[in-house]
Swiss-Prot record:
Keyword Nucleus set for record: no
Protein name: 5'-nucleotidase SurE
Residues that coordinate or bind a divalent metal cation: 8-9, 40, 93
Record field: catalytic activity: a ribonucleoside 5'-phosphate + H2O = a ribonucleoside + phosphate
Function of the molecule: Nucleotidase that shows phosphatase activity on nucleoside 5'-monophosphates.
Amino acid sequence: MRILCTNDDGIHAPGLKVIEEIARALSDDVWIVAPELDQSGVSHSLSLNDPLRLREVGPRHFAVRGTPTDCVIMGARHILGEKRPDLVLSGVNKGRNVAEDVVYSGTIAGALEGTILGLPSFALSQEFSIATRDKPSWDTALKFGPQIVRKVLDAGVPKNTVINVNFPSCAPDQVKGIVVTRQGKRNLGFLKVDERRDGRGNPYFWIGFDRAAALDVPEEGTDLAALAAHYVSVTPLRLDRTDEAFSGKLGSILA
């Protein structure tokens, strides 16, 4: 099995080494194609107005000056040649990708691009807390990642579906199990615009997070609830975002 790995944290991110270890537990034919620079939050951006620079950083390890989407396309359609990958693994992201994160995440987008190309694809992310920010529980991803990917692959991944896996911020022996979840919804009151001034007095801004905002109270069955309870969250996400439930009513409204 030929595996293409990417991420959004960049070619030198520690989580990329973790995804490579997970991939090597499944196959010896592993290729790494990751962004030259950190691309967190770029979502499914595709570079159309800038050329892509490709740099080989080691055997089967390539850096692309572009987005995770660019990396998957470059890997599947150029670097790997005529022998296409059989699987795309994106991650392991430093930080969870749950709830509304799936819209912003470059990690999710890397896996979605694999799905668009007709390849079974997984996005993997490791949650951290304020206390473990500098040292996430990578061992948790290493322990549970290979078995989850293997079992889902053996069962078959439906067309146009990407598998979003999130590991809780705890040691492997503290994980209570693996649960299938749905995408949650968090309190977005924590988002804020942080205005500052440069040396010349001109304003500039950061999108920031208000740590004093009310904490999430996740609904049961969601990815947020699973992580809070120290479960590994596995969420199938569909490429087709059509709201089927509203389509009929919308048709009546517009008739």
